């Protein structure tokens, strides 16, 4: 995502300069940077963000063309240089595509996200105006299943929605003139707000090419577009409001945002954090509304320091790599692997997260996150491809060790998660030698196999070796 945002805004700045400059050498440099950004954006290969941010990119390109319309001059030399750069770009991008073609094909032909048919809907409307509360995530653990499952998915750009839209409309009415950029940004915000919160018919989603975009991924384009329209509106209404009017609007808006954050994160944001939300929203709003001496010399520095502290407090900046590399359980598994190399399986419904931690520490693990599906491995248990729809996807994989072969070896837990139910015999077929499990596997009965405990129980999980009986 950061690379995509960098690519969008660097390319937009260069495109604006390209149209405004007449020096061929400068234009060649701008075009080269634009094409580099285009390659960066294209090779991200994440349609949910590419398509939604593509709408924003198209709006920005359109507005820049409108801004320079009537003054755009492209010489024959400029055209030849641009064609040459395009040709070189196609060669480089083509080589990358050819090299990665297998991976690209695997991703495009998955049941998820390749065959996803999203119609949007399901995003709580309150989440659109509760971005301020996410600033507390680095300082206070967040896990509220009724809203979302983790801090990453719940995080938002602090965009002060809908202040930017309100100010933009106010400014256009005051000036009796439509601001093209603001109008198009508001259109994008409206489109994705409706798509994310309400949804739309599948046929319309297909027409608008949104079937690969989930509601949760819309928050990125909404945040960026809201910030853009907020900055634009602040420039338009500069000096239109007195400090008293700004203070009144700030108080009302900050109160609404504080309430919205409390309502959205009911068990997370208590009374104290509501007050803090009010203060943060108030400072940010006042800085936008009143571009005076107080805003520049007092409010802006306070806000800047606050955002800096919040940003620096995000993992892993705050804690370093110790939470990943110094876990006693993982250190024990590393030691066991060095003594007896072999593949591990992490048993348990939450084993997929622990499996990723194991992989991050160099442990050969069966059920880590599969960005592209490992069809060859899973077809060892499913030669007739009965469950291919389940495991042919981007997914977090959980393992459940059972005593008898399950009627359903694979079960779908979520669009990006499935569980494989296996006996030790099936694990051996997959190449697994060791299992880390919360179950007492050495007390369970298996046909022709058993488990031998090979380490200490740490955090409720014990390492075992699979033993085959003659």
Model-identified regions with their sequence ranges:
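Hydrophobic alpha-helical membrane-interfacial segments at the cytosolic entry of transmembrane helices
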Residues: 74-97, 183-191
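Perimembrane helix-loop-helix junctions
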Residues: 53-87, 174-176, 283
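Transmembrane alpha-helical segments
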Residues: 7-19, 58-63, 67, 165-169, ...
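Periplasmic/ER-lumenal interhelical loops and adjacent helix-loop junctions
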Residues: 96-177, 181
């Amino acid at each position: 995502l950061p690379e995509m945002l960098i690519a969008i805004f660097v390319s937009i700045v260069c495109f604006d300069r390209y149209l405004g400059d007449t020096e061929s050498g400068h234009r060649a440099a701008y075009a080269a940077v634009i094409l580099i950004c285009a390659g960066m954006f294209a090779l991200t290969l994440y349609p949910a963000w590419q398509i939604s941010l593509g709408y924003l990119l198209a709006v920005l390109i359109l507005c820049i063309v409108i801004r320079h319309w009537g003054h755009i001059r492209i010489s024959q030399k400029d055209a030849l240089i641009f064609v040459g750069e395009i040709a070189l770009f196609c060669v480089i991008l083509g080589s990358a595509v050819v090299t990665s073609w297998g991976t690209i094909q695997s991703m495009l032909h998955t049941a998820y996200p390749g065959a996803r048919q999203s119609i949007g809907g399901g995003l709580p409307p309150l989440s659109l105006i509760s971005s301020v509360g996410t600033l507390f995530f680095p300082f206070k653990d967040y896990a509220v299943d009724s809203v979302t499952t983790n801090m990453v998915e719940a995080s938002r750009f602090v965009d002060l929605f809908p202040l930017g839209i309100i100010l933009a409309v106010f400014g256009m009415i005051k000036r009796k003139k439509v601001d093209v950029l603001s109008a198009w940004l508001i259109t994008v915000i409206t489109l994705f707000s409706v798509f994310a919160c309400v949804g739309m018919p599948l046929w319309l989603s297909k027409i608008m090419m949104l079937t690969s975009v989930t509601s949760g991924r819309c928050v990125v384009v909404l945040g960026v577009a809201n910030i853009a329209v907020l900055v634009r509106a602040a420039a338009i209404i500069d000096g239109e409001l007195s400090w008293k009017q700004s203070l009144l609007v700030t108080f009302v808006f900050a109160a609404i945002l504080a309430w919205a954050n409390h309502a959205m994160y009911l068990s997370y944001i208590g009374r104290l954090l509501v007050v803090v939300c009010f203060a943060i929203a108030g400072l940010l709003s006042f800085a936008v509304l009143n571009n005076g001496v107080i805003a520049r010399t007092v409010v802006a520095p306070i806000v800047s320091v606050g955002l800096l502290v919040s940003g620096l407090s995000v993992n892993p900046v705050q804690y370093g790599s110790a939470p990943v590399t110094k876990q006693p359980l993982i250190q024990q598994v590393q030691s066991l692997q060095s003594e007896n190399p072999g593949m591990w399986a992490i048993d348990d419904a939450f084993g997929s997260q622990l499996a990723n931690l194991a992989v991050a520490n160099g442990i050969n693990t069966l059920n880590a996150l599969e960005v592209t599906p490992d069809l060859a491995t899973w077809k060892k248990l499913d030669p007739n491809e009965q469950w291919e729809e389940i495991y042919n996807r981007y997914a977090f994989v959980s393992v459940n060790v059972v005593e008898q072969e399950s009627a359903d070896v694979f079960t779908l837990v979520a669009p990006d998660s499935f569980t494989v139910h296996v006996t030790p015999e099936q694990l051996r077929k997959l190449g697994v030698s060791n299992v880390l499990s919360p179950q007492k596997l050495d007390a369970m009965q298996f046909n022709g196999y058993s488990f031998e405990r090979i380490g200490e129980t740490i955090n409720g999980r014990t390492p075992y070796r699979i033993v085959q009986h003659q």
